[in-house]
A protein has these predicted regions:
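N-terminal accessory regions of S-adenosyl-L-methionine
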Residues: 1-92, 237-239
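Conserved alpha-helix/loop element of class I SAM-dependent methyltransferases that forms part
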Residues: 84-108
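Conserved class I S-adenosyl-L-methionine
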Residues: 106-116
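Gly/Ser/Thr-rich loops at beta-strand to alpha-helix junctions
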Residues: 114-120, 179-180
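Conserved SAM-binding loop of SAM-dependent methyltransferases across substrates and taxa
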Residues: 117-129
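S-adenosyl-L-methionine
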Residues: 134-170
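A short SAM/SAH-binding and catalytic strip from SAM-dependent methyltransferases
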Residues: 168-182
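C-terminal substrate-binding/active-site "lid" region of AdoMet-derived donor-dependent transferases
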Residues: 181-250
Length: 250
């Protein structure tokens, strides 16, 4: 994965097609922001070629480049994995979404739990929200990607963090694991210590994040504000990443 960008650039030059070039440039831009520890200004454009797009490009570049095009498309579709392995992040927050969370939900103070490298905390802080970022940091003890968080992270399990920072306007959890019951325990702690604040999860329904039990509950809130927030966070790959909010009463 360390040679990911080099391989991508080499294949793009070999294929020499504007649609491919645009996507490789988008990845280079994203990587430069992440490497600098800065949130993106907006959500990334969609990456990867859909089957019909793949065929259109292949017709234009010729059948002799089919192998290179398939290799490149595989790399495009695995960009999120590259981000996780190199930077320890699964989600790409952006300033536009962070600003909407602040404005539409009237957030002045926030707590990010299970924050990992706290990229979302960095984005929220940049739009003027006072943020407390917490994580048990167990994963960071065995991973080099945990050495350089984007924002200061306090060593604190989720339930204890929610209890300690019970006056915040927002509790945020991005990419809760799709195993165990950490998400259910989070909802229980929030319901006990700070049920009047907003509780947001960033993830994929019935997919890459959160437990099956979490998604099968009748506790999700719908609102025009949430629709607008999600419109600014359109997923860049095959993972249908969205922001979901838990009802204050359920």
């Amino acid at each position: 994965m360390t040679k990911f960008l080099t391989k991508l650039t080499k294949l793009e030059q070999e294929i020499n097609h504007p649609a491919v070039k645009r996507q490789v440039e988008e990845i280079a831009l994203i990587d430069s922001y992440v490497q600098a520890g800065k949130p993106l200004k907006r959500a990334p454009r969609r990456l990867g070629l859909l089957p019909d797009e793949f065929e259109e490009v292949l017709v234009e570049v010729g059948p002799d480049k089919e192998g290179a095009l398939r290799d490149l498309n595989n790399l495009l579709n695995n960009f999120r994995q590259y981000l996780s392995l190199i930077y320890g992040i699964w989600s790409l927050p952006n300033i536009q979404t962070a600003q909407l969370i602040k404005n539409k939900l009237h957030v002045q103070t926030a707590l990010e739990i299970m924050a990992g490298n706290a990229y979302w905390s960095q984005a929220l802080a940049q739009v003027g929200i006072k943020v407390h970022s917490t994580d048990s940091l167990e994963w960071a003890k065995t991973s080099t990607t945990g050495a350089k968080p984007f924002y200061p992270v306090e060593d604190l399990p989720a339930d204890q963090a929610i209890k300690k920072y019970h006056t915040v306007n927002l509790v945020l959890c991005s990419w809760s694991p799709n195993f165990g019951h950490g998400d259910l325990e989070t909802v229980a702690a929030w319901h006990k210590y700070n049920p009047s604040c907003h509780l947001l999860f960033v993830g994929e329904k019935d997919g890459a994040t959160n437990s099956p039990e979490f998604w099968h509950q009748n506790w999700f809130k719908n609102s025009a504000a949430l629709d607008e927030i999600n419109h600014s966070l359109q997923s860049f790959d095959f993972i249908n990443e969205k922001v979901v909010e838990i009802k204050n009463e359920f």
